[in-house]
């Protein structure tokens, strides 16, 4: 009896293997189940299919909108990807800043104005940190306020002062670097930052730059006028200075001082400062506003300039000055959309002679 039972079970097992579990049989079984589900549960299946189709259409529509919309109104769908955003708006100046694809936000910016009393020129600053946010935050929180105090003192007795906007800028930038280096060295913090500062008075625009943040101005004819020049290791002047100091530059994705830093001047960076291969000395330029009759200026971290040329950025903003952020938000989003991996900060300042703006 037991032998007969075992024989029967063995036969059933062979039937299962050779007939029911054959690929053709399983395929027909799946088709049969699908047809049965459709005809006997029509409403549920049709709802699932319709929802899937609607979802696909929505995604395709959003992608097409992003690809075709030059003004980037449809890019709000991407904003969920930004871990953090910052923005600032005050009648003639707008700032938009995103952390973007980086794990940390190391960009900082500052705006200090006194349009009512005009006790000092307007102060605009961009600080792009590296190696952590310590240096950028330190400079942002101290340098603009220090400039404000010294500029107010200067304005009270300008006629008798031997100082100028240029000398005040240079003195305060170098002073903040020395002060910060003392603190960073004690804590072994190797952070550094760029420093782009613009002083805007009634007749002049004075711009100081350390590093590779950049300023560009749009003049009355729509031309892009550089307000600063990047400090890069591959530039002949910088390369010679680094070599004289006993340093070197090497290529690792970009030209770097001692194979480390992708700019030749910065604030902070105490290990490279100790070698004197990276310096904090600013380049300072002054522009005659009556001569240029500018419409606006752009101050930005290198996240923008990795995606836009000076001329392209000016054209882009010029077409969007009527937007709430004067085009700053749109150009930041466009830089992100073009694949920029960095933090991106853009400040747009409209001048008094530009449309819908009556004063600095």
From Swiss-Prot:
Cofactor requirement: Mg(2+); Mn(2+)
One GO term describing the cellular component: membrane
Annotated InterPro entries: PP2C, PP2C_BS, PPM-type-like_dom_sf, PPM-type_phosphatase-like_dom
CC cofactor note: Binds 2 magnesium or manganese ions per subunit.
Broad enzyme group: hydrolase
TM regions (residue ranges): 26-42
Effect the entry attributes to changing residue 302 to A: Abolishes phosphatase activity, prevents MAP3K7/TAK1 phosphorylation in vitro, does not abolish interaction with MAP3K7/TAK1, found in a complex with MAP3K7/TAK1, MAP2K4 or MAP2K6 and enhances the association between MAP3K7/TAK1, MAP2K4 or MAP2K6
One Gene Ontology term from the biological process aspect of the record: cell surface receptor protein serine/threonine kinase signaling pathway
Documented EC number(s): 3.1.3.16
Segments in the Extracellular topological domain: 1-25
Function: Acts as a suppressor of the SAPK signaling pathways by associating with and dephosphorylating MAP3K7/TAK1 and MAP3K5, and by attenuating the association between MAP3K7/TAK1 and MAP2K4 or MAP2K6.
Similarity annotation: Belongs to the PP2C family.
PANTHER family the UniProt entry points to: PROTEIN PHOSPHATASE
Name of this chain's protein: Protein phosphatase 1L
Originating organism: Mus musculus (Mouse)
Gene coding for it: Ppm1l
């Amino acid at each position: 009896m037991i032998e007969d039972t075992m024989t029967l079970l063995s036969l059933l097992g062979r039937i299962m293997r050779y007939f029911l579990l054959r690929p053709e049989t399983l395929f027909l079984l799946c088709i049969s189940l699908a047809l049965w589900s459709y005809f006997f549960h029509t409403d549920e299946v049709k709802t699932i299919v319709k929802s899937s189709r609607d979802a696909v259409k929505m995604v395709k529509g959003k992608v097409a909108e992003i690809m075709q919309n030059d003004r980037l109104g449809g890019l709000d769908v991407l904003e969920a990807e930004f871990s953090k955003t910052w923005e600032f708006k005050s009648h003639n100046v707008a700032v938009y800043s995103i952390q973007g694809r980086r794990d940390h936000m190391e960009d900082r910016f500052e705006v200090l104005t006194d349009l009512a009393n005009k006790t000092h020129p307007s102060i605009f600053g961009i600080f792009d940190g590296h190696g952590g946010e310590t240096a950028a935050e330190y400079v942002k929180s101290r340098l603009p306020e220090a400039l404000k105090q010294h500029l107010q003192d200067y304005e009270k007795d300008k006629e008798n002062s031997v100082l100028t906007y240029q000398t005040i800028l240079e003195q305060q930038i170098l002073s903040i670097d020395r002060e910060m280096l003392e603190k960073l060295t004690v804590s072994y913090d190797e952070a550094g930052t760029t420093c782009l500062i613009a002083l805007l008075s009634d007749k002049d625009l004075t711009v100081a730059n350390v590093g590779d943040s950049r300023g560009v101005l749009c003049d009355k004819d729509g031309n892009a006028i550089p307000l600063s020049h990047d400090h890069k290791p591959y530039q002949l002047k910088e390369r010679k200075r680094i070599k004289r100091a006993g340093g070197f530059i090497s290529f690792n994705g970009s030209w770097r001082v001692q194979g480390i830093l992708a700019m030749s001047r910065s604030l902070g960076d105490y290990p490279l400062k100790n070698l004197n291969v990276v310096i904090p000395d600013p380049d300072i330029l002054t522009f005659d506003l009556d001569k240029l009759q500018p419409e606006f200026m752009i101050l930005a971290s290198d996240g923008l300039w990795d995606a836009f040329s000076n001329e392209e950025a000016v054209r882009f903003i010029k077409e969007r000055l009527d937007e709430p952020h004067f085009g700053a938000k749109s150009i930041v989003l466009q830089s992100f959309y073009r694949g920029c991996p960095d933090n991106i900060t853009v400040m747009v300042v409209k001048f008094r002679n530009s449309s819908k703006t009556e004063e600095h």
